[in-house]
């Protein structure tokens, strides 16, 4: 198998895994928002966060479509992925806030 074919297969595999991870965390973020009380995140912030998660999932779907439509291996720029990474970090932050809130609620 030529090296460029192997590199293309590796790139496809890595991107598929990365996009699946983004999907997982964006879905997890939506689930967390549904159980998030107002004392942790007010309704306006929850709505805005949820909208950004939906937009990011649409971007991931569009990226997948472009990758599948291409006859050549393609990469995704860091400029495109940076906002997704930031959003995943926000999901982790929300998970931490909810855990602290749950702990506080059980202690009071």
Which residue ranges define each predicted feature?
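A structural signal for well-ordered alpha-helices, especially hydrophobic packing surfaces
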Residues: 19, 23-33, 57-60, 64, ...
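Amphipathic protein-protein interaction modules
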Residues: 44-86
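Short terminal alpha-helical segments
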Residues: 1-38
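Amphipathic alpha-helical binding modules
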Residues: 71-108
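Heptad-repeat coiled-coil alpha-helices
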Residues: 28-31, 35-38, 42, 62, ...
